[in-house]
Amino acid sequence: MKRFDIWLVMKNPEKGRVVDNLGLCTIVTPDELIELPNLIVAPMTTESENIESRVQCRFDNAIGYIMVDQLRTIDKFRFIKKLGELESDVQLRLCDCLLEFFAL
């Protein structure tokens, strides 16, 4: 497991206006902290608008979005299967989006 990996994670229903089932996600936890029991992830979706807090990407021949505004921490036992890794240009755009999202 490492930062920018794309994983299929165990579905976990949530309440309110958050994504109900994570499905695909990107790990955003820094590699220096990857040994912790929980990781910070950004859910991925193909059903979104291209808004400032979403990073557009292509994965598995589909256009999708990494939802920086839906970050969450999940236990490692919920990670089912590694499916790939973000391309380097998407990694840079995701880092820029995270910096802007958390700017004070």
Regions found by a protein language model. Name each.
Residues 1-104:
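Conserved functional hotspots at enzyme active or ligand-binding sites that engage polyanionic ligands
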